[in-house]
Amino acid sequence: MGVTILQPYPLPEGKSGAHIIDQLSKRLLALGATHAGQFLVDCETFISTPQPHNGAPGRAVHVLHNSEYPASTFSIIDNGTGKQVAIVADNIFDLLMLKMTNTFTSKKQTKIESRGARFEYGDFVIKLGSVTMMEHFKGILIEIEYKSCVILAYCWEMIREMLQGFLGIAVNKDFPSYFAPQTIMTAMGQQQLHAKHNDIFEPMDTVKQYLEQFTNYRKHVTLMGGMGSGPGSQQVGPNVHMSPAVAGLHRS
């Protein structure tokens, strides 16, 4: 695998998610991309029970699956204070969580997934995801992988140009938020700024990006004014600048 980036796509007023994904699919095919099956990434969150009574944050276990790795279950344990522990296990981990009902309870109302078509274009793999939570449409999430590189710092500009050329939106020159420099504690107990964009990319990095985006979608507020939560609803999304090219796509 190579470096993978997630990019939310703005859904214009009056257009359904299905319509926009259809238009993006046609654009990819016109560029010479080939359809290469379907994909699915899902996330279910379990909350510790009982919840602390002293106001302290409770623990959460996020369980994710990625169709690119069908034999694996990805788990991210959050202690509620910002510290996370990531685990990769086989699918028996799902059965384990079902047997821990006295300790963790599933928040089924927030179960969320991104699914859709998968395309291959040269060294790129592009996935057009329709994000739904409890069968309610939440937005469009684009996944793009550059297979020929495993360190973002070496290929970000190429990925960025591909995103802008295909999507027609302005993509920030800065590295995505997931790759922002982080403060870590060294073995000597000293704080040090760590440049994550120089790390070798791993499958868990893709999963963590999905959790980041899914968390954002869970927080989204549906715009008022006759826009329900069905497939054609308009959702509050990230601030993304649209070029004239993509504006024309929206009007089609």
From Swiss-Prot:
Pfam families: Med20. One of its GO terms (cellular component) is nucleus. One of its GO terms (molecular function) is transcription coregulator activity. It is found in: Nucleus. Keywords: Activator, Nucleus, Transcription, Transcription regulation. The keyword Metal-binding does not apply. InterPro entries: Mediator_Med20. Component of the Mediator complex, which includes at least CDK8, MED4, MED6, MED11, MED14, MED17, MED18, MED20, MED21, MED22, MED27, MED28, MED30 and MED31. This is Mediator of RNA polymerase II transcription subunit 20. It comes from Drosophila melanogaster. The gene is MED20.
